[in-house]
Amino acid sequence: MKESTAILALANGTIFKGKSIGAEGQVNGEIVFNTSMSGYQEILTDPSYARQIVTLTYPHIGNTGTNFEDTESEKIWCSGLVIRSLSQTESNWRNEENLSDYLKRNNILGISDIDTRKLTRIIRNEGSQSAAIIAGEDIEEDSAVSLAREFQGLNGLDLAKEVTTKTPYDWTEGTWRGKKANTNFKVAVLDFGIKKNILRILADRGYELRIFPAKTEFEELISINPDGVFLSNGPGDPEPCDYAIDTITKLTERGMPLFGICLGHQLLALSLGGQTSKMKFGHHGANHPVQDLKTQKVAVLSLIHISEPTRPERIGGGGVGGEK
């Protein structure tokens, strides 16, 4: 079978030629890199990557295949996938489909056999930028660069309303090896693009979970008499989400315990008077070392930031300063 060609074009005019490992066609979005060494299926299905083309810095991808359980949502949300090398074999007892077929079945473009170290350095030095992947025959480089430049970035885009659940639902499933704690807390979850594993971990704590759409109003949330409200992860720019900021403000005024992660963390900061600004390049990955300057201990973390100078006084210290 003849291999299809593909190119990745950046808005700065840089071209990478490689092999197509997914669907044929064309797509654009914001290109980012993720430093995780595993979990590529979870990354692909994480709603936080909506409208982004994800570059995996680890060079060898696909060796464990894919399955129908290790997903963070019901579909692939990222616009495209960029890797250095696609494994030609899959070795895992839970494998059900190889990565290439998985991408094709979900109509997602992917490109391999490019210099991902060079690409990552460009993103690191120049910042996240628009990009495009074109896969198939008779690809024109100028057209690919033009397609990349058509994407205007994520600033100002409210993507939470596109990835959120349409109707409320309950969640009880825990992690597959987890043992549920015995608690009686009821938690309302505002879904801005929540990952299933976050819900599983919360369920392991014994929480009674009710998940609500992103635009759920204050009155409906408190109608279930929750002990707290969880503000989920999600994609896009937090500032256009006025509906969520308004609801969160009312919750804080009521004294409701709140916990935000990713987009939810940024929305909580905005509701309390903080500010967010786009980072030069995002800290995507689960393997970022952070040292506690008091204890000298190092933790390996996923990072979420707000601008330290704008941190509201009523938010305690001890977190990691930065930007979104």
Question: Which residues make up each language-model segment?
Answer:
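Short solvent-exposed loop/turn micro-motifs enriched in small/polar/acidic residues
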Residues: 1-2, 283
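RNA-binding accessory domains that recognize and position tRNA/RNA substrates
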Residues: 2-215, 219, 224, 238
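Short, solvent-exposed coil/turn elements at secondary-structure transition points
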Residues: 116, 193, 215-217, 264, ...
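Ser/Thr-centric signal marking residues that sit
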Residues: 116, 301, 310
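Glycine-rich, phosphate-binding/catalytic loops in enzymes
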Residues: 205-206, 246-248, 323-324
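Conserved functional loop/turn residues at catalytic and ligand-binding sites
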Residues: 206, 225, 255, 310
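Cysteine-nucleophile active-site neighborhood
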Residues: 227-228, 233-304
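Single conserved hydrophobic/aromatic residue that forms the stacking wall/gate
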Residues: 304-315, 320-324
